[in-house]
């Protein structure tokens, strides 16, 4: 057949039959819709399985990363610890002198006295050592004589009497600084490890080929071994050493110096400290023993609250006095107050070396809450030591303890140690601090407002309707009050300027007096009686330890009559009865 039709392909058999619809399911088979659903389910399961595998891989990678990080931290720890210990520095006071403390690996305690030489003691924690650089030491014989005057020796008595407590506070600060320096070194080393992990992206190929992981680890191990080895090998002294004769056989039996002049000076100085320490300790013991007898003879006359009252023990300006700390502790055990309050100046200079006196004072409370508004002779170091000992240090916020709401703050001024000069801890005056506390109290009416200086207390007490039932302060080492401010609603505020609980005479105190002496003036402690229903202070009873070790218990001073309290005020304050509970004066 010729023409176009001849080139056509012949039709296959059945080619002209109509096509079956796509949705027709052959008998016994799976239709297209069901097949699509099956394929969708399969793909979902496949994706889920892939996701599970990826999560497992992610967790595996994360676990490997954490393990490598942990190994890196452990590997870096030795060098970080060495760096931290060898770079720890602290500035503080020992006695009246400004001192720099620096830890090292010399294996001994070196006291650098400038031009007159150095003193050395074996370190109790070898190979770790300590360099103590004492400031303000001159080279002339006249200056050396002033260093070991009776006043200066008295200031160093605590170092001889309680060397462990005096040094431990400084060691704590050094340890904190060493940890901080060590953490910084650890971070730098870990950054180096992270950089090593990214070396292929950061370094040229020829360096990568030469410095392999195995070689890097070997180099690091050698460096660590050399550093640790150099620390453990004892170092021989470079300069000649001369023993201090008075130290032979005593607690400083290993004391040596590198100067003959210094050996003679320390010989005389340690003799003076030993003599003065023995004298002071005996005086403290005699005072405590005599005062304890006077206390035991008057147990029945000690302050006692009525059944509907609680009792607060308050004091101020203890100044680390050892004798009074012991006697106040006995007084607290005998009277069992519900809470203790200090209006500050608990230390002499606020140095780390006064940790021992802070621990003794904290033990006075015998388990009851102890709250403090620190004074101008205390410091941030003092506050940290108090918190560590369990004392609540007020910081401008209301604190709830033993059913009392107490508001107070530390003094904005701080005395330079062993000086009458003061510096500002923050840009705030006494009056501004007091107004801030008044504004914070607002209409909440705290139970107690606690400050240190009268300048602050004056602002609070001159406020219309002072926002506290009890306002306490100290600072002047002289009792004044109680002063009662009546409110418009018939309630009242009691204000009290407390004397010195340490019996410290101010002129002597500023001349480097020491906590290791009996009270020089009346040592005063106060008991405040608080009505449980209304929270009002109904009485004050001062207790005095005189310089002759006699105990004087004043009569209870009534500060308010609950019977005259308006009924609506009583109900608002929480009291339901109008019956007076004021105890008559004894």
Show the residue positions of the predicted features.
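Acidic/histidine-rich helix-loop elements
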Residues: 272-285, 309-324, 347-352, 415-428, ...
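His/acidic metal-ligating clusters that form di-metal
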Residues: 333-335, 402-407, 413-494
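Non-catalytic terminal accessory segments
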Residues: 2-298, 567-586
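Extracytosolic and intramembrane catalytic regions of membrane-associated proteins
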Residues: 286-306, 318, 326-336, 384-388, ...
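Active-site metal-binding loops of divalent metal-dependent hydrolases
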Residues: 316-319, 344-346, 376-377, 410-412, ...
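Core catalytic region of metal-dependent phosphoesterases/phosphodiesterases
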Residues: 207, 302, 315, 320-400
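Conserved beta-sheet core of the metallophosphoesterase superfamily
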Residues: 362-364, 368-371, 453-583
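Beta-strand-turn-beta hairpins that frame and shape the catalytic cleft
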Residues: 259-271, 303-312, 397-408, 413, ...
């Amino acid at each position: 057949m010729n023409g176009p039709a001849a080139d056509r392909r012949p039709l296959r058999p059945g080619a002209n039959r109509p096509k079956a619809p796509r949705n027709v399911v052959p008998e016994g088979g799976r239709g297209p819709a069901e097949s699509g659903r099956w394929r969708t389910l399969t793909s979902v399961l496949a994706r889920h399985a892939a996701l599970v595998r990826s999560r497992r891989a992610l967790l595996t990678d994360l676990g490997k990363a954490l393990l490598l990080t942990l190994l890196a931290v452990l590997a870096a720890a030795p060098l970080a610890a060495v760096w931290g210990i060898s770079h720890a520095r602290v500035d503080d006071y020992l006695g009246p002198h400004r001192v720099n403390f620096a830890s090292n690996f010399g294996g001994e305690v070196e006291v650098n006295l400038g031009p007159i030489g150095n003193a050395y003691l074996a370190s109790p924690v070898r190979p770790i050592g300590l360099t103590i650089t004492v400031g303000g030491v001159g080279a002339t014989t006249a200056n050396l004589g002033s260093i070991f005057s009776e006043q200066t020796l008295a200031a160093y008595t605590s170092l001889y009497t309680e060397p462990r407590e005096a040094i431990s506070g400084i060691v704590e600060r050094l340890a904190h600084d060493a940890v901080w320096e060590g953490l910084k070194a650890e971070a730098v080393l870990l950054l180096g490890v992270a950089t090593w992990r990214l070396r292929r992206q950061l370094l040229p190929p020829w360096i990568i080929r030469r410095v392999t992981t195995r070689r890097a680890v070997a180099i690091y191990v050698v460096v660590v071994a050399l550093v640790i080895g150099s620390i453990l090998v004892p170092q021989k002294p470079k300069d000649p050493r001369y023993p201090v004769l008075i130290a032979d056989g005593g607690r400083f039996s290993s004391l040596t110096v590198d100067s003959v002049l210094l050996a003679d000076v320390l010989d005389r100085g340690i003799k003076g400290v030993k003599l003065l320490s023995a004298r002071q300790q005996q005086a403290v013991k005699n005072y405590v023993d005599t005062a304890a007898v006077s206390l035991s003879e008057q147990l029945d006359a000690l302050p006692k609250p009525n059944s509907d009252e609680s009792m607060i023990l308050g004091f101020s300006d203890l100044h680390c006095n050892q004798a009074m700390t012991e006697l106040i502790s006995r007084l607290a055990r005998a009277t069992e107050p519900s809470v203790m309050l200090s209006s500050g100046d608990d230390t002499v200079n606020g140095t780390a070396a006064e940790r021992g006196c802070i621990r003794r004072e904290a033990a006075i409370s015998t388990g009851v809450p102890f709250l403090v508004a620190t004074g101008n002779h205390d410091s941030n170091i003092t506050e940290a030591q108090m918190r560590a000992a369990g004392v609540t240090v007020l910081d401008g916020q209301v604190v709830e303890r033993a059913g009392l709401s107490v508001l107070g703050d530390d003094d904005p001024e701080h005395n330079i140690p062993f000086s009458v000069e003061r510096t500002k801890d923050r840009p705030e005056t006494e009056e501004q601090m007091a107004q801030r506390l008044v504004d914070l109290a607002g209409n909440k009416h705290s139970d107690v407002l606690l400050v240190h200086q009268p300048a602050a207390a004056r602002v609070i007490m001159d406020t219309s309707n002072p926002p506290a039932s009890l306002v306490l302060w100290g600072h002047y080492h002289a009792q004044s009050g109680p002063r009662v401010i009546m409110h418009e609603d018939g309630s009242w505020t009691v204000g009290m300027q407390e004397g010195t609980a340490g019996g410290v005479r101010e002129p002597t105190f500023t001349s480097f007096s020491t906590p290791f002496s009996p009270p020089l003036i009346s040592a005063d402690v106060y008991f405040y009686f608080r009505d449980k229903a209304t929270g009002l202070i109904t009485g004050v009873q001062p207790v005095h330890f005189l310089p002759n070790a006699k105990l004087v218990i004043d009569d209870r001073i009534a500060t308010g009559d609950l019977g005259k309290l308006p009924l609506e005020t009583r109900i608002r304050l929480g009291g339901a009865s109008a019956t007076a509970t004021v105890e008559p004066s004894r």
